[in-house]
From Swiss-Prot:
UniProt keyword Glycoprotein, yes or no: no
Similarity field: Belongs to the jacalin lectin family.
Subunit text: Tetramer of four alpha chains associated with two or four beta chains.
Signal peptide span: none
Name of the protein described by the UniProt record: Agglutinin beta-3 chain
Gene Ontology molecular function terms on file: carbohydrate binding; IgA binding
The keyword Transcription appears for this protein: no
Length: 20
């Protein structure tokens, strides 16, 4: 998350968890 200063974002959707 950019607001948290973390370069890694985790997106959770119908397909499951995705790390980009």
């Amino acid at each position: 998350d950019e607001q948290s200063g973390i370069s890694q974002t985790v997106i959770v959707g119908p397909w499951g968890a995705k790390v980009s």
